Amino acid sequence: MSSDTSPAVVTTPPPPSMPHKERYFDRINESDPEYLRERNMSPDLRQDFNMMEQRKRVTQILQSPAFREDLECLIQEQMKKGHNPSGLLALQQIADYIVTSSFSGFSSPSLSLGMVTPINDLPGADTSSYVKGEKLTRCKLASLYRLADLFGWAHLANTYISVRISKEQDHIIIIPRGLSFSEATASTLVKVNIIGEVVDQGSTDLKIDHTGFSPHAAIYSTRPDVKCVIHIHTLATAAVSSMKCGILPISQESLILGDVAYYDYQGSLDEEEERIELQKVLGPSCKVLVLRNHGMVALGETLEEAFHYIFNVQMACEIQVQAVAGAGGVDNLLVLDLQKYKAFTHGVAMSGGGGVNMASHQKWKVGEIEFEGLMRTLDNLGYRTGYAYRHPLVREKPRHKSDVEIPATVTAFSFEDDSAPLSPLKFMAQRQQREKTRWLNSPNTYMKVNVPEESRNGETSPRTKITWMKAEDSSKVSSGTPIKIEDPNQFVPLNTNPTEVLEKRNKIREQNRYDLKTAGPQSQLLAGIVVDKPPSTMQFDDDDQGPPAPPNPFSHLLEGELEEYTKTIERKQQGLDDAEQGSLSDDAASVSQIQSQTQSPQSVPERLEENHELFSKSFTSMDAPVMIMNGKDEMHDVEDELAQRVSRLTTSTTIENIEITIKSPERTEEVLSPDGSPSKSPSKKKKKFRTPSFLKKNKKKEKVEA
């Protein structure tokens, strides 16, 4: 085909009505130095600049008066409609933040429902001079001021609540003059002494009202048992204080108050006569004081008890005012007998917890259970009271009998120092280890069971998996420790110095670290008992405390004769002189005669010398029998033969006839005669001769010379 016949490409120009679209590069001047700087900038830095620009625009919008007015109008319209969704609460908090930032910290009441000043502001203040007890008391007192404000008891003049925090130094904390009850916090309270001098100013520059503080100081000085004083004069209490009848026992609240004291208050208690009169009126146990034509005062050993009485005083006064107005006078009211119903009302209220203690293991003080409920209410509203609750609100989940109360064995965790901070990662690792140890130390018995797996479609799979199930055999299940440890110092004796307890604990921990083995703790019950040791069996070894040895029959011999006798003994031990056994009978007879004379209890002093001479001569002439009598255990055969032959011999003396039988294996107790020589009782048996001490000494000398 030729080129002329090929189809040509036809281009259609754009219609003239379409406008020209501006591109990005048409708006940018490439020679602009600002554009060149941004183009050469790194991407991360360019992104940071963009975020800063966006935040600047958001800040400008939030700080603009127009946005604040629009937001307030929106919230007002939503509140008029009655709806209160979560989004509205979020907008309300934003509005509170903006309004408080714009108006120097003063917020609008209609917009401050979601934002309140926290009561416990001590973490942000300088609290180095406060001890732990004072911090808790400050939080309690500030919470009590907030409750008085919420109940409508606040008054601009002479209405105060005070607490004594130190009985030794008479330090009292009270709210300063000019600070409303709704602004009371733990750090704004002022600490003064009993005469009104400031000890700790707190976080404000305001001063206390000495006129309003004078009744508190007078009560504290007259009643050392009082810790808290609450003084109010609401409409109901002021009205009842002006009645001649006073508080009438016409309601349960009035019966709970018990004895009520009345005092003609003149506006101040600075004079000594007035304080003496107040002391007479109060008495030792009165908890409610009526100031005539002024108001009411409640006393308490704790803050909770004082609040308990002031709350019932307010309720009793309101009931009385309404009853008098409705009945047309006091004469038309039914007045109860206070003494008759005191045991059912005041006695139960004074027992603590409104009678809850009668069937509960938790012992509550007067007004404490009600005060904790109000503190939980304030905490739920966001007041952050800082109150230390005694018991949790939510009851613990009931556990099965097989659950472990305490691990069966002691865990092997490493002890951490109390002062050193614990990292979160380390805490999580220890938590996992504790769970594992709790599982391993469980006293429950488990069985390994193969359970078939289930497939996705619901059918049973041929494969099985291992599952641990609790053993049904109750005999194999061991019980845990029945004692529940609620306090780490549960087994520490009472009235013990805490420093000594910590030192003892650290010492025990050190012993556990180094694995020291000791005999264990010493019993305090058996520490002072002296145990008598049983008498030991008779021993024939030479000792210093034993009975005195018999007189030495060889004391008159010379050294040469002793050496010759020693050599003779050695030859006999070596078996060199066996042919001389024929003279056994004669020598044995002489030995038996000597024994009868030395062991007889009727031996006389005149014959002692003859016996000793005969005894010494027999030992000098004695060969084999002497060796057997003074020998050791290796000569048992010869000794038995001697015993058999000597037993046939009898010796007749001038005093009495004694038949001697020598039994070598037996040992008898020695009985000494008055002269120190051993004697024999007729009821006791013979014993063999001991080895003389001088022979042992000679053997030792020979060994040393060798």
Curated annotation (Swiss-Prot):
Composition bias type Low complexity, residue spans: 1-11, 590-605, 651-662
Keyword NADP: no
Compartments where located: Cytoplasm, Cytoskeleton; Cell membrane; Cytoplasm
Chain residue numbers at which the record places covalent cross-link Glycyl lysine isopeptide (Lys-Gly) (interchain with G-Cter in SUMO2): K484
One matching Pfam family: Aldolase_II
InterPro entries: Aldolase-II_Adducin_sf, Aldolase_II/adducin_N, Aldolase_II/adducin_N_sf
Topology versus the membrane: Peripheral membrane protein
Keyword Cytoplasm: yes
GO biological process: positive regulation of cytoskeleton organization; positive regulation of vasoconstriction; response to xenobiotic stimulus
Cellular component GO terms held in the UniProt record: brush border; cell cortex; cell-cell junction; condensed nuclear chromosome; cytoplasm; cytoskeleton; membrane; plasma membrane
Site label Cleavage by asparagine endopeptidase (AEP), positions: N357
Domain notes from UniProt: Comprised of three regions: a N-terminal protease-resistant globular head region, a short connecting subdomain, and a protease-sensitive tail region.
Subunit structure: Heterodimer of an alpha and a gamma subunit.
Name of this protein: Gamma-adducin
Organism, as annotated: Mus musculus (Mouse)
